[in-house]
């Protein structure tokens, strides 16, 4: 695989130019590093904008859509993000492989939980923080790496 797109909540964790959830930041940084083991190019909007320190002055949806089009796999942590929902719509319409990271204790619409029925992918559940899902993500990336070779 050449490129992985990481879709996750963004705005709710930014206060001015400060990122306010260190646990989620740690998770996304570890996830990014893990993805770099499997793809030469990894897109994470949080990284592009330095976790709120360097917000884009002229943001355009077309920027993220271009990144999505060029991706082989998306790893999505939808939580309650409408932006991630839009990105999942793009990815499923393009039949991209989607790895969904869902909180076992949160309710999700069937459209999210069952997205793998219309596009390739897998749903992974975590408890007590997203970081506890990294092992499962690694195993899933390994599976898709072998299938895409």
Residues covered by each model-derived region:
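Conserved catalytic or regulatory cores that recognize and/or transform ribose-phosphate-containing ligands
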Residues: 1-149
